[in-house]
From Swiss-Prot:
InterPro entries: CWC24-like, Znf_CCCH, Znf_CCCH_sf, Znf_RING, Znf_RING/FYVE/PHD, Znf_RING_CS. A zinc finger (C3H1-type) spans 187-215. Coiled coil: none annotated. It comes from Oryza sativa subsp. japonica. Residues 47-64 have a biased composition (Low complexity). Residues 1-14 have a biased composition (Gly residues). Residues 81-100 have a biased composition (Polar residues). GO terms for cellular component: U2-type spliceosomal complex. Residues 1-142 are annotated as: Disordered. Gene3D superfamilies: Zinc finger, CCCH-type, Zinc/RING finger domain, C3HC4 (zinc finger). This is Zinc finger CCCH domain-containing protein 15.
Length: 326
């Protein structure tokens, strides 16, 4: 029994239960940041550990309590443009622009020919009797091309100039115009339906491609023609001694003119017979005016040239017709 008891005690002492505690690290704590390699500030005992801070959770936009104190009307600009803040350099609308597609003026055919003519002229002035190979200011062994020889015929024929060679066609490519001035004229005459304008009816109806308008329009050439005719008439009135104004008298002026009309011819001093009027507004009988014009080309009253123009005096004839009716 003693052995059994001793064995039981020994067995119970050898198989004693062992309790082991395992600590799990919290999952919601941020890990310690990794220190850079070779850092001298690392503490072996962990006394300098960085306290982990919980990350703040951003408020959800779907939450009813979410709000912002910023101005709601202020929205970020999607497009933004800023000028260079420099004054525009070109303000002449390319009025002085030049054609830059042609050969430069210092190396084109005209410039080469001008240099050749100048070289020949200088060589003749220096030594007119020099040989052809010694043309120019350089040595006689320098070859300057077929056109570099001295012109020994100078003075016996028409001299070579650029202006004289242009017409003959021997100048070569002519220099293009550097400046070009264009004037455009636009005539906005509408295409009006002729049938609708004259009759007010068009067989095509609304499908007509011309404009249905019965108004009066004048194109540019018509306006210019009327202006030229008015200017000619004004200059003619000035040449005849008038003031050149085209003022048309009103009814009051017409009444005054009727009262100022003469009742007899200035020449024969008798009532008018076929009255006529001159440019200077003097009234005569037709027979008296022609008889006086055959002797003197000037007016009988004011001595101004009549130029042989005698118009029918409609005012005198109307007044004579009214007097007969009364």
């Amino acid at each position: 029994m003693a052995d059994g008891g001793g064995g039981g005690e020994a067995g119970s002492g050898g198989s004693a239960p062992v309790c082991s505690f395992v600590r799990k690290p919290p999952k919601n704590i941020r890990k310690r940041p990794t220190a850079p390699a070779g850092s001298d500030d690392d503490d072996e005992d962990g006394s300098g550990a960085i306290a982990a801070a919980r990350a703040k959770k951003a408020p959800s936009s779907t939450s009813k309590l979410f709000f912002s104190s910023a101005d709601g009307s202020s929205e970020p600009r999607r497009f933004q443009y800023e000028s260079s803040r420099t004054i525009q350099a070109s303000t002449d609308s390319r009025a002085t622009a030049t054609l830059e597609t042609e050969t430069e003026f210092d190396r084109d055919a005209r410039a080469i020919r001008e240099r050749q003519l100048k070289q020949a002229e200088e060589s003749l002035k220096k030594n007119p009797s020099a040989p052809a190979s010694s043309s120019g200011s350089g040595s006689g062994e320098v070859y300057k091309g077929i056109h570099g020889y001295t012109d020994y015929k100078a003075g016996f024929r028409r001299e070579h100039t650029v202006s004289s060679e242009k017409a003959g066609g021997s100048h070569g490519p002519l220099r293009a115009s550097a400046h070009i001035r264009l004037s455009a004229r636009f005539d906005y005459q509408p295409d009006i339906c002729k049938d609708y304008k004259e009759t007010g009816y068009c067989g095509y109806g609304d499908s007509c491609k011309f404009m249905h308008d019965r108004g009066d329009y004048k194109s540019g050439w018509q306006i210019e023609k009327e202006w030229e005719e008015a200017e000619k008439a004004r200059k003619r009135r000035i040449a005849m001694g008038g003031d050149g104004s085209d003022y048309e008298a009103g009814e009051e002026d017409d009444d005054d003119d009727e009262e100022a009309l003469p009742f007899a011819c200035y020449i024969c001093r008798e009532p008018f017979v076929d009255p006529v009027v001159t440019k200077c507004k003097h009234y005569f009988c037709e027979h008296c005016a022609l008889k006086h014009h055959s002797k003197n080309k000037k007016c009988f009253v004011c001595n101004k040239p009549t130029l042989g123009i005698f118009n029918a005096a409609q005012e005198i004839r109307k007044k004579m017709a009214q007097d007969k009716k009364q």
